[in-house]
Amino acid sequence: MMNRLLVFVMLGAAFMLVVSAVDQDAYEDVNMLKRGGTPCPCDGESMSGIIWFWSCPAGWRKCGAEWPAPCCKAIG
């Protein structure tokens, strides 16, 4: 019984290791939506920025429309 539990725990740990190693850049658009932002066109690219109300936060730059709210993109 203890051996089965140990095997189950080890397989779970291996699974979590593989899942956490997934390339996070592939999910940039999904992560953007998780931050609560609405996507907007930025620098001629399709939907690469997000709308921030009032002004862009630190670490972000204006890259698109000014009205009704600025379109911002992360620097870097």
Curated annotation (Swiss-Prot):
Propeptide span(s): 22-33
Domain of life per record: Eukaryota
Cystine bridges: C40-C71, C42-C63, C56-C72
Sample GO molecular function, one term: toxin activity
Signal peptide range: 1-21
Keywords: Cleavage on pair of basic residues, Disulfide bond, Ion channel impairing toxin, Nematocyst, Neurotoxin, Secreted, Signal, Toxin, Voltage-gated sodium channel impairing toxin
UniProt-listed Gene3D superfamilies: Anthopleurin-A
Cellular compartments annotated: Secreted; Nematocyst
A single GO cellular-component term on record: extracellular region
Biological function: May affect sodium channels (Nav).
UniProt similarity note: Belongs to the sea anemone sodium channel inhibitory toxin family. Type I subfamily.
Protein name: U-actitoxin-Avd7a
Species whose genome carries this gene: Anemonia viridis (Snakelocks anemone)
